[in-house]
Amino acid sequence: MAVANSSPVNPVVFFDVSIGGQEVGRMKIELFADVVPKTAENFRQFCTGEFRKDGVPIGYKGSTFHRVIKDFMIQGGDFVNGDGTGVASIYRGPFADENFKLRHSAPGLLSMANSGPSTNGCQFFITCSKCDWLDGKHVVFGKIIDGLLVMRKIENVPTGPNNKPKLPVVISQCGEM
């Protein structure tokens, strides 16, 4: 399946993003709970702050996009370490690849970042172009339905070593619509 058709039952979440302290806009993202419910729910709870550790909400608010590669993808979600090494999930540890039904067939698709088979956690990336070589390796679980320009603004931030943005790219606010 190239891209899932929108479904009224699927949750829609949002990221408000700032670059270098300046708000640049909002991305609205449909989560494909109808195709990959466990993966979508993990992401949704990190957007809303519903998941708590020791009574404290944990999730994407205040975290960064720590890796940006123009014409490929923008990666974020490491609210543990902020550098791409952190792993957390609502399932207490890394979780399995749910399925690979959806493909990396277009820009604006949300997919799980991982370090090999069944190592999903909190990190994700958003495709900036078709990335079919990732099919069967990373779980696609959502798509930007509004705010593709915000993704393009992030994609064009200057980067340094390890594709780290030279300006902080921060999820200043997030939640469910």
UniProtKB/Swiss-Prot annotation:
Keywords: Acetylation, Chaperone, Cytoplasm, Isomerase, mRNA processing, mRNA splicing, Nucleus, Rotamase, Spliceosome. This is Peptidyl-prolyl cis-trans isomerase H. InterPro entries: Cyclophilin-like_dom_sf, Cyclophilin-type_PPIase, Cyclophilin-type_PPIase_CS, Cyclophilin-type_PPIase_dom. The keyword Acetylation applies. Residues 14-176 form the PPIase cyclophilin-type domain. GO terms for biological process: mRNA splicing, via spliceosome; positive regulation of viral genome replication; protein folding; protein-containing complex assembly. Inhibited by cyclosporin A. Its EC number is 5.2.1.8. It is an enzyme of class 5 (isomerase). It comes from the Eukaryota. It catalyses: [protein]-peptidylproline (omega=180) = [protein]-peptidylproline (omega=0). GO terms for molecular function: cyclosporin A binding; peptidyl-prolyl cis-trans isomerase activity; ribonucleoprotein complex binding. It comes from Homo sapiens (Human). Interacts directly with PRPF4. Part of a heteromeric complex containing PPIH, PRPF3 and PRPF4 that is stable in the absence of RNA. Component of the U4/U6-U5 tri-snRNP complex composed of the U4, U6 and U5 snRNAs and at least PRPF3, PRPF4, PRPF6, PRPF8, PRPF31, SNRNP200, TXNL4A, SNRNP40, DDX23, CD2BP2, PPIH, SNU13, EFTUD2, SART1 and USP39. Heterodimer with PRPF18. The keyword Ligase does not apply. It is found in: Nucleus speckle; Cytoplasm. PPIase that catalyzes the cis-trans isomerization of proline imidic peptide bonds in oligopeptides and may therefore assist protein folding. Participates in pre-mRNA splicing. May play a role in the assembly of the U4/U5/U6 tri-snRNP complex, one of the building blocks of the spliceosome. May act as a chaperone. CDD domains: cyclophilin_ABH_like. Disulfide bonds: none annotated. It holds the Pfam family Pro_isomerase. The modification N-acetylalanine is found at A2. GO terms for cellular component: cytoplasm; cytosol; intracellular membrane-bounded organelle; nuclear speck; nucleoplasm; spliceosomal complex; U4/U6 snRNP; U4/U6 x U5 tri-snRNP complex. Belongs to the cyclophilin-type PPIase family. PPIase H subfamily.
